Amino acid sequence: FAAGITSFKMYLTYPAMMIGDGAVYSALKALKKRGGIAGVHCENAGVIDALIAAHKAAGQTAPSSHPECRPNPLEAEAVAHLLRITEVAGVPIVIVHLSTKEALLEVMRARARGQQVYVETCPHYLLLDDSVYYQEDYSAAARYICAPPMRKKEDQEVLWKALANGTIQTVSTDHCSFTLQQKDAGRGDFTKIPGGLPGVETRGELLYTAGVAAGRITKEQMCALLSENPARLYGAYPRKGVIAPGSDADLVVYDPAADKTITAGTQLSAAGYTPYEGWRTKGSIAQVYLRGTLAVDHGEMKAGPIGTYIPRHPGAL
């Protein structure tokens, strides 16, 4: 906290990273004393492991087993479990990369009890569904492995409505730049496929296209989801998240008339692929300014490493 780090991530799954209920509670109480906040990945690790063992015993090791071993109820159960712990601890909490209608219902129940619960989702949960895992081409299916996995189209519609009515506060990427070669290293065992997708470069254009241009959300809501709300929630506001005297001149210039086709050939990420290959966007990002300096111009980097460390304060939405 002395260095200005006020937000932390915890996991209820992944054996190498998850912590037990007592440790979660103790960490939340420590954060409460200092005004910090935690973002938590919520899936039921024990049942997921049992389902994985059953699939492997049956010889079911293709990417299609991935969503079947991480079904909707196991995200919802973990969210409900965490929210009861945070109720006892008396702290606000962030549910990161929420993907299901059932998990969102648990959030709404907690809010009805008076709890402060914030929600993040990602473009891939808004735009992709679990059919991507059932492709015959192993490599094509493997590139979509992430956790939570893609869900059903009905989950997508619930998430879009939640963005529009303010139930979800932020849209992030959960960006992971694993290459296709790294993804292929898990061939023959879906649990060995590195989990995560690249998404930093496409988030804004996809949210504008499928959200604003499609009439699901307004431009103002998009700006809040991508900028203002995260800045407030994680203690960077008003230095970040607002155009105002004294704030950093971090600006994105969006040209709604400059439609484009997303393709890996124009991506700067080390991943070398995009989950949205061939998708057409309504408009595109023209320029990105960082503290008043032109950093990106029509997809080309124009500035060197000019980032600075930003100490943060306790946030609030």
Regions found by a protein language model. Name each.
Residues 48, 104, 127, 181, ...:
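Active-site-proximal flexible loops/turns
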Residues 61-92, 143-144, 165, 169-171, ...:
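His/Asp/Glu-enriched, well-ordered alpha-helical/loop segment
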Residues 146-149, 173, 291, 297:
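Thr-Gly-centered strand-to-loop micro-motif
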Residues 1-171:
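Histidine/acidic residue-rich metal-binding segments in metalloenzymes
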Residues 185-189, 245-309:
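C-terminal cap of metal-dependent C-N hydrolases
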Residues 59, 133-138, 185-187, 214-216, ...:
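Short, glycine- and charge-enriched coil/turn segments that flank and shape catalytic ligand pockets
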Residues 310-317:
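Short, solvent-exposed cationic patches
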Residues 13, 98, 176, 257, ...:
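Flexible loop residues that form catalytic
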